[in-house]
């Protein structure tokens, strides 16, 4: 629950993509920086949508499409997936009767149309309904909930078709000021570009509020790297044409002790890598799940910039504890290198709960 979004049945939306997106934008109150005339929360983490329908695939129960709903811009971006919203899709499928509830745990097979990948959501069930309450805590999310384990199956090459889109573990990017930096381009669950914080002159433990006082330098630098990487990965013909959501850009650093956004001390010996990422035009207050899977995967691929800063413990166990502005979370990566790097699956735990079910009114209705 580091995200919030509406789950819409595909057959209730216009079949025409333009009409569909217009309806979703109206529903969220976009374009408007405050989304005052809709259900959007004026934050990238709350301006998300899921479109769901029964799947006709043998390996999936539901088809699920994720969209980033523009806030100030009249656009719905479908280029990538969201792990948090994926967890909610499993709960939604059981609530809607798309999947028969099986106690004590129901496995919902989700085909994500954004990445053409299957995700297994292991949802706890009691009395025929998803269990919502529990003692599993996620840093950055108030309270606790029932643990939902997500397994992203064969997540490599989600958008580019390759785990290493350029075939290299490191590439070089020349920044606008002429500096050259080493980056790693990896595509697992979502494509991302990784850069060391120290190579940009940062500690790596900076909190989102830092960008309010630096004149936009960090955000602009990361966006330059991100859009340059989009072209290098074949995701866009030019920097200007790059999706605002994909690829992710991630700034990584070695394990170190720091203060989280809520003032808690995150001990360096309890984590394996420190990372910061963007959420559209601002710094992420926590960390994207799909971006975390890609980060954990990159950290275990020998020779990447993330691998150069991750703990030796993570390399030995294939379990990566990633530290972000709000705290930390854990990933389990099943990675092989028999005839080249290959990710069999990636596991992460989330929570999800329904807030309401009802009717929303859009223009013309």
Specify the residue positions occupied by each region the protein language model found.
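A glycine-rich beta-to-alpha transition motif near the start of alpha/beta enzyme domains, typified by
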Residues: 2-365
């Amino acid at each position: 629950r580091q995200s919030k979004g509406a789950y819409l049945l595909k057959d209730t939306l216009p079949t025409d993509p333009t009409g569909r997106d217009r309806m979703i934008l109206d529903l969220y109150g976009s374009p408007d920086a405050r989304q005052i005339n809709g259900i959007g929360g004026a934050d990238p983490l709350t301006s998300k949508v899921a479109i769901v329908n029964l799947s006709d695939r043998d390996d999936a129960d539901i088809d699920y499409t994720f969209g980033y709903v523009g806030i100030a811009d009249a656009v719905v971006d479908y280029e990538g997936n969201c792990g948090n919203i994926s967890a909610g899709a499993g709960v939604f499928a059981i609530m809607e009767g798309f999947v028969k509830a099986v106690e004590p745990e129901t496995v919902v097979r989700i085909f994500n149309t954004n990445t053409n990948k299957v995700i297994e959501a292991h949802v706890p069930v009691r009395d025929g309904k998803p269990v919502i309450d529990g003692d599993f805590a996620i840093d950055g999310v108030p309270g606790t909930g029932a643990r939902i384990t997500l397994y992203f199956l064969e997540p490599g090459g989600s958008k580019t078709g390759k785990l290493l889109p350029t075939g290299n573990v490191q590439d070089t990017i020349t920044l606008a000021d002429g500096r050259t930096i080493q980056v790693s381009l990896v595509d697992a669950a979502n494509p991302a570009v990784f850069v060391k914080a120290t190579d940009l002159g940062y500690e790596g433990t900076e909190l989102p509020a830092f960008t309010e006082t630096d004149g936009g330098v960090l955000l602009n630098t990361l966006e330059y790297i991100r859009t340059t990487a989009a072209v290098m990965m074949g995701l866009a013909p030019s920097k200007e044409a790059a999706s605002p959501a994909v690829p992710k850009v991630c700034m990584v650093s070695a394990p170190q002790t720091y203060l989280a956004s809520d003032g808690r001390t995150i001990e360096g010996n309890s984590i394996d890598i420190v990372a910061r990422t963007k959420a559209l035009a601002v710094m992420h207050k926590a960390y994207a799940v799909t971006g975390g899977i890609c980060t954990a995967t990159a950290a275990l691929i020998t020779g990447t910039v993330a691998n150069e800063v991750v703990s030796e413990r993570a390399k030995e166990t294939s379990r990566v504890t990633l530290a972000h502005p709000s705290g930390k979370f854990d990933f389990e990566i099943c990675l092989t290198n028999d005839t080249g790097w290959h990710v069999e699956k990636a596991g992460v735990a989330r929570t999800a709960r329904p807030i309401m079910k009802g009717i929303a009114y859009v223009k013309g209705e």
